[in-house]
């Protein structure tokens, strides 16, 4: 590994829970439904994050635990069975139903796995019922996707076909572009997980080579490996360098000649670097502090430091899987400080002491920091934006240059003084 300093910290946290991942998962698999077993607070969180109109028919909902459930005056399992049956009667197009645990359901020990098992027996294949936890007690933000994918893996059929499996949710247009590149390289059998329909799961076996698109899929990667798949070690496809190394790792795994890879990637790299130039001009030399939330922090820091010239003050991450992150950490500048976990008060003190030009953080911390004159970027935007791949490098950089340009416009006197 590089000379990066790895530290651990524990204490009060300021992060979204794993329920938030429903917002992009329900868009990815339109034949699935995500039923949160939780409180009105859970319902408000998902509804607000998704921005769904009141008249829409969303593919998620909340079975709200009332006081009777919390006090044990009603059998929560029976109540949940009733809610599920009413839902399926109203929405017969649902093919896969995810029961999603929350803080309240975890606290009162509702056994969602037992509920799912009983419903699968009763429904006799009409709908597949799965469960995972999105509880803030057990998960943060993006880990909800990890739980959902892990729940799907036992349903994946076996196969001896040689294939490349892209694992992690991507924007459809980005995925199509990446698959097209792999096809041009000569890798014809490319599938994605999660699929665009929950019932069209890719097959898996010893000839399956897994290329992770997201860094937060620890449990998913472990389960796929247990199924016999090979995990390709590579940085993640953020920025020109990361995306290039990611594609090259897949090509090497399939024995594709380097000259073929270069002939296809070099024009994309040249175009992407030119598109990056105006953003690099704005970002170069600026100090960046990343607070933990999405587990994208390390790949983002690598991109912003190596390709955009930013000075990294600290990289916070909720969890650090050293195996999945080894290729990323090796590319970081040697003086980087990585902090796993969070004590939010201590981290905020370090933010103030270091006077960064930009802080990447959760929505709950952004406004207070902005009020102190510190420019911020919501980490949630990285998950909702199409930022993966060589072609998207300039769009990714713009997410960080934009708040700095906004700050300059709002503070023209300070900008002139600093210049």
Swiss-Prot record:
Pfam families: Oxidored_nitro. It is an enzyme of class 1 (oxidoreductase). It comes from the Bacteria. Its cofactor is [4Fe-4S] cluster. Pathway: Porphyrin-containing compound metabolism; chlorophyll biosynthesis (light-independent). Binds 1 [4Fe-4S] cluster per heterodimer. The cluster is bound at the heterodimer interface by residues from both subunits. One of its GO terms (biological process) is light-independent chlorophyll biosynthetic process. This is Light-independent protochlorophyllide reductase subunit N.
């Amino acid at each position: 590994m590089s000379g990066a300093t790895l530290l651990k910290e524990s204490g009060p946290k300021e992060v979204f829970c794993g329920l938030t991942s429903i917002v992009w998962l329900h868009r990815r698999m339109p034949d699935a439904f995500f039923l949160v077993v939780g409180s009105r607070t859970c319902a408000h969180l998902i509804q607000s994050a998704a921005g769904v109109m009141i008249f829409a028919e969303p593919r998620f909902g909340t079975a709200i635990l009332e006081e009777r459930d919390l006090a044990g005056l009603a059998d929560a399992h029976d109540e949940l069975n009733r809610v599920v049956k009413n839902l399926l009667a109203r929405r017969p197009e649902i093919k896969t139903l995810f029961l999603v645990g929350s803080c309240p359901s975890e606290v009162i020990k509702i056994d969602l796995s037992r509920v799912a098992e009983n419903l699968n027996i009763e429904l006799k294949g009409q709908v597949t019922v799965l469960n995972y936890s999105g509880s803030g007690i057990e998960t943060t933000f993006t880990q909800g996707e990890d739980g959902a994918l892990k729940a799907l893996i036992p349903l994946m059929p076996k196969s001896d076909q040689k294939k490349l499996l892209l694992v992690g949710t991507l924007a459809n247009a980005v995925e199509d572009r990446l698959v097209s590149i792999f096809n041009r390289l000569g890798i014809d059998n490319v599938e994605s997980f999660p699929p665009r329909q929950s019932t069209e799961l890719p097959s898996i076996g010893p000839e399956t080579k897994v290329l992770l698109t997201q860094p937060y899929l620890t449990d998913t990667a472990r389960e796929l490996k247990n199924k016999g798949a090979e995990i390709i070690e590579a940085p993640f496809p953020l920025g020109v360098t990361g995306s290039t190394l990611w594609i090259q790792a897949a090509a090497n795994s399939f024995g594709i000649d380097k000259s073929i890879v270069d002939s296809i990637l070099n024009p994309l790299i040249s175009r992407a670097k030119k598109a990056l130039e105006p953003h690099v001009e704005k970002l170069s030399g600026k100090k960046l502090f990343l607070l933990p939330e999405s587990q994208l922090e390390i790949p983002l820091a690598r991109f912003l430091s190596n390709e955009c010239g930013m000075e990294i003050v600290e990289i916070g991450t909720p969890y650090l899987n050293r195996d999945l992150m080894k290729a990323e950490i090796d590319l970081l500048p040697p003086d980087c400080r990585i902090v796993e976990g969070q004590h939010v008060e201590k981290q905020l003190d370090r933010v103030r002491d270091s006077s960064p030009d930009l802080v990447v953080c959760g929505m709950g911390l952004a406004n207070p920091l902005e009020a102190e004159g510190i420019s911020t970027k919501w980490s949630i935007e990285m998950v909702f934006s199409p930022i993966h791949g060589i072609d998207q490098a300039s769009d990714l950089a713009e997410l960080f240059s934009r708040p700095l340009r906004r700050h300059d416009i709002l503070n023209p006197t300070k900008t002139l003084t600093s210049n």
